[in-house]
Structures are given as C-alpha cells and as structure tokens.
Amino acid sequence: MEEFQRHIELDRSWQHNFLYPLIFQEYIYAFAYDHGLNKSILLENSGDKKYSLLIVKRLITRMYQQNHLILSANDSNQNAILGHKQKNNLYSQMITEGFAVIVEIPFSLLLISSLGEKKIVKSHNLRSIHSIFPFLEDKLLHLNYVLDILITYPAHLEILVQTLRYWVKDASSLHLLRFFLYEYRNLNSLITPNQLISFLKKRNQRLFLFLYNFHVCEYESLFVFLCNQSSYLRSTSFGALIERIYFYGKLKYLVKVFTKDFGVILWLFREPFPHYVRYQGKSILASKGTSLLMHKWKYYLIYFGQCHFSVWSQPKRLYINRLSNHSLDFMGFLSSVRLNSSVIRSQMLENSFLIENISKKFDTIVPIIPLVGSLAKAKFCNVLGHPISKSVWTDLSDSDILDRFGRICRNISHYYSGSSRXXXXXXXXXXXRIFCARTLSGKHKSTVRAFLNRLRSEFLEEFFTEEEKVLSLILPRDSSISRGLYRGRIWYLDIICIHNLANDE
C-alpha cells in the first residue's frame, strides 16, 4: 500500500493560483514566451484564426467595460450571458476557446521543462501512434485472449470538472470551467445530457479534447499501475492521475478483500503480464492467460468505472475474444493472428511419418467496405463506390486538383502499406485516380475517357505511389537487404494525418 501511495504522489507546487488571474493580466504574454512556448499554440487555434488569445482578452475587457456580463441568481436562465442568443453563443465560445488555450500552458511548461532537463517524461505518453502496429505485430503472436474496450464518455459534466480538480487547486478557475460547461447546457436547453458531450465535441474541440484526455488518463491510471506491478521491467512512460482524496473510501466498494490486503490485487494480475494499447476512445488488452483471467480484468474495469466515475459500463462495451478466431477492428485495420500449418514428411529407416508444424502470423486486412464509406463521406463517391465529381474543387487549378488527389492516394497507400493483403488499398488508390479524372473532366466539360487519353503518362506519374520508388532512394536495388524489403511489409511511421477510418466516431 505504501508503494501505491508513493506511485500516486504528485508535485503540487504549481497547482495553486492556476490560471484564472492570468486571463485578466497583461503578463500572460511574458509568462508564456519566457518559458519557451510555441507561439502558434497561443496565437491561434488550428484551422480557425478568429479564436486568438488577443481577441479573447479584448473581448473580456469589452464585456466588463460595457457591463455585458451580468450574473443573476433569480434569473430563469442562471449564469447566462445576457443579450441576443447569437451574440451570447459567440461570446461564450470565444471565451472558452481562450480558456482552453490558457489551461494548456502549465502542462505544456511541464512537458518542455522535462524535455529540457532530458528526463523521462512520466506524465505524458510520447509513443508514436504508428508504432502501435509494429508493437501488435511483435506481441500478439504470443498471446491467447484479447479484451476489446470502448472507453465511455463521462455521464455528467461534473465528472469532467472533478477529473481536473485533483490536479488544479485553484477554485476560481474550476468555477469558471463549470460556468462554461453549464452555459452550453443552458443556452441549448433542447440538448439532453447524453447529447451534451457530443455537442461539446463539435462546438469546442480544444476544450473538449483537453478535458477528455484527462478523463482517459484517469481511467487508465490505476490500470497502468497494476500493469507496472506485474512487469519485471517497470514502465515509466505513464503518469498516475488518480483521484487521491476519496480513492481509499471508494476502494471498499470494489471487492471487500481489496481493503484487507492490497497485495491480493497485485496477485490477481501478476502473471501473465497483459499488454495494453489504446488509440483515442478504443483500447485493447491482450494476455497469454486464460479466459478466467480476462473475465477478472473485465469485471475489475466495470467495478472501477462504477465506483471511480459513477458510470455503469455496459457489458457490450467490453468483449473477450480468442485471438485465434477473432479479428480486431482497430485504427482502420482488421487484424488477427492467423495459424499457418505445414506438413513435413519424415522417414527414419523403414518407417515414415508426417509432422505437422503450426506457426502464427499477424495478419492485417484492409476493410474495403468502411474504406469506401470513408471516401463516400468525403463526397468522392457514392455508397456503392461509383465516382462523383468533386464540384467544390473545380475552381482550383489543374495542378492543385492533381496535388490534392495525389496526396490522398499516397496517404491511403502508405497508411495501409503494412497490410498483409494490400490489394484493397491498391484498388482504393486506383479508384482515387478515377475520382480525380471525373473532377477534371467535369471542369473541362469533357468525358473521363477523353481526358485520360489526353494526359496519359503525366496523369499516372502524379499518382505514382509504389513503395519501390521510395525504397530506391534509400537502398540500392542490387543489395540483398533491399530485395528482402521490397517483398516484405513496410510500416510508414512518419504519417501525421490519419484518415477518419482510424478515428472513433
């Protein structure tokens, strides 16, 4: 128990006087730049330049000078910004955007200071997204069962605030956060509590992602601690974001034996060591153990969610499957462990017999139906895969259209380059060429066939995405190593933009 208490101990020196005064002070700029923050983080939100910190500060000053912000406890719409609804929504959204920018500052400073001192960053998981696939390729071959987990959204807004409350000890900033969240609910009274999280996700990406990441870290905290205890090589890449005030009080509701002997918990999960990986709201837990061990993990996670988040985890959100006959739908791939059998005839003296060898292979398949659905969602084709002219791009130059479609083809080809059956990705890349030809022919008022006959080699060269062209820049074609790489699968780990098949809706 003492080791667990040390594990969840946190340096609280920077938790006080957190951010609320900074919103109204000029020295926020000096505070940010003196600590080496990236300028782009502060000045603008990605993809939308109207939510700058300067605009938010001027807006707050203007609101207080003109007395726009009036709070009334007797008003039917409590804590609402008075005025026209459209203007209120704009004010609220801009302030929350500025709030989200400022609330990231201390955590960015923590990351930058850790990197500057060249220490292991314990409170940030810096693992590359695309390193997940080589990890699965190496580990799943030796495991038996897998537990598919869908991390639930918090059932109530207050849970989001409480998740942040045990990191931030500035009460005024937390009250301001509550004001923003309930302001959204009051101004949109027709939205049910179940729809509010989805509404926040679409309305204010930055603030929602910040709060949701804290929610996920809280969900993983005790789980990661138990995994570390069962490993001989302890992991230091995760930080423990445990609710430290009421945890021991809630622990007795899980299983009574937990409060009597904390070592019993560790014994349940000590061997064999489970492998855990997550992307966004979906995670998998794989183990070499038995089905009984996986059921223990399942009910442990259900109890933890009930007592720690007051959330009932529906059984349908946790699936236990055997890897030998189950495919994982993860990050846009259908992955499975395939058994390959080979029969060898052996003869000793006058006796001959057959020996059957069974080997495991990590198999990744490109799901063609979801891939077509993803292209249809982007208005490149219909649900049946028939090409549609991208009319909104017809105002662009031909070179810009070719560049955009070429980038789409390269992303699809590179993202699925590690697939063991890449025929579907090649077909999707070829279909993207037809989509491009349809768009260009519509722009020039000609047929697709005539357009292809006119361009021919230039058009195909723009979409040349064979991996041999990339490898030829790295290795000579006559080397034995390169010949092996040409025949094998290649994972491109430097892709920044992942298409929406990999994203959880």
Curated annotation (Swiss-Prot):
One of its GO terms (molecular function) is RNA binding. One of its GO terms (cellular component) is chloroplast. Keywords: Chloroplast, mRNA processing, Plastid, RNA-binding, tRNA processing. Pfam families: Intron_maturas2 (PF01348), MatK_N (PF01824). GO terms for biological process: mRNA processing; RNA splicing; tRNA processing. PANTHER family: MATURASE K. This is Maturase K. It comes from Blitum bonus-henricus. The gene is matK.
